[in-house]
Amino acid sequence: MGIQDARWPSEDEETHLLDSSSAEQTRGEKCSDSTPDVHIVEEYEDRAPATCQAPSTSTDTPVLSSSMICPPRQRVAHKCTQCGKCFIYRYELLEHQRLHTGENPYRCSQCGKAFRRTSDLSSHRRTQCIKAAYICIKCGNSFQSIQEKFRHQCVHSVQKFDCSQCGKSFKKMHLLGKHELTHTQNRIFTCRQCGKVYPGMSELRSHQKIHPPELSNQCMQCGKFFSSSACLTAHEVRHRQQRTQICARCGKAFKNKHDLNLHMRSHTGERPFQCTYCGKRFSVSGNLNIHVRTHTGEKPYLCSDCGKAFISAGELQIHRRTHTGEKPYKCSVCGRGFTMASKVTLHMRVHTGERPYVCSECGKGFSRGSELKKHSMNHTGVRPYACQLCAKTYTCLNHLKRHLKTHSVIQNQSV
């Protein structure tokens, strides 16, 4: 089945269009009868426009428009002739007017459902339309699951390189060359720890990650372990590389001025990059790009073993360790291995007794910020997790789950 949408929204369009009508109401408010259909709105620092003020929202997370993030000197306000609401951008007015006309120009080619906005269609295809969620955008083939879609190799118009000895095909010439070595070379690579044999060094190294590393090959500066002393020596060279840029506040050294400036934001609190969906700010643009994917649902990094998708390469790398068994970060006290460096830091507090997160109300200390957050709810009275069956509330999700089991037990006893 082919994709037949007359117009598929681009990423730029989805970035401009908001996903909820509440954002539309935040931008536009009724103007007075004397207000012309198009007029100039002056914007100044620390106050809203004089002619069209955006009403405040009662939610904790405000919806921020692009004009609030980077306010220009002047904006042209566009007024709806039917209800009097004003909008800064013309595309916002056109989108709003579809509420009056009932027009839904964006139609899903798989199920026929129509939508008023491109972002609604995009969200529908990602999360609701079963037929559209598993379609190859290159060839139009549909699949029953995301795993089948991932395993599907779309080879249309892709040049293939065939092995002359066994007929196996490859997409790239260097992959074919690497494969042909398995026919011409008699050399094999054996794991010294378990005796398994592999045709190439890369396959052997990938296998060796499942074995616990030798304790003698540990970097004294960062704690990482290596399979050989040669790898450890090469790694230690990176620590000894000249770092001339020194932070005046904490003494940390960096290779160049750019890295130092990025680091300084951790001291100054500067976060110049803001999310247009929820208003959250970031010190690095790359972190913002990854965060935006939590709103758009984009997960471009796929695991080649199970097909699971992730929003960043870092998350995929950590997930891959569940398949390989690799735990490169070791505790220097007890030798326990971890898949992430941050988990080692948290674990070390078990040995040191460090509790850096202190409650401002009672002075109690905690090793994790999440534990302090849960504890603070006892002082504030906030209990965000409510049971839908008996209206009991809890400060912790696990406590709610444990409570819900009591309902299932009572129901089974009554039967």
UniProtKB/Swiss-Prot annotation:
Renumbered zinc finger spans (C2H2-type): 78-100, 106-129, 134-156, 161-183, 189-211, 217-239, 245-267, 273-295, 301-323, 329-351, 357-379, 385-407
Pfam families (UniProt xref): zf-C2H2
InterPro entries referenced in this protein's UniProt entry, alphabetically: Ikaros_C2H2-ZF, Znf_C2H2_sf, Znf_C2H2_type
Any Gene Ontology biological process: regulation of transcription by RNA polymerase II
SMART domains: ZnF_C2H2
Predominant place of localization: nucleus
Region (Disordered) location: 1-36
Keywords assigned by UniProt, alphabetized: DNA-binding, Metal-binding, Nucleus, Repeat, Zinc, Zinc-finger
PANTHER family: KLUMPFUSS, ISOFORM B-RELATED, ZINC FINGER PROTEIN
Descriptive protein name: Zinc finger protein ZFMSA12A
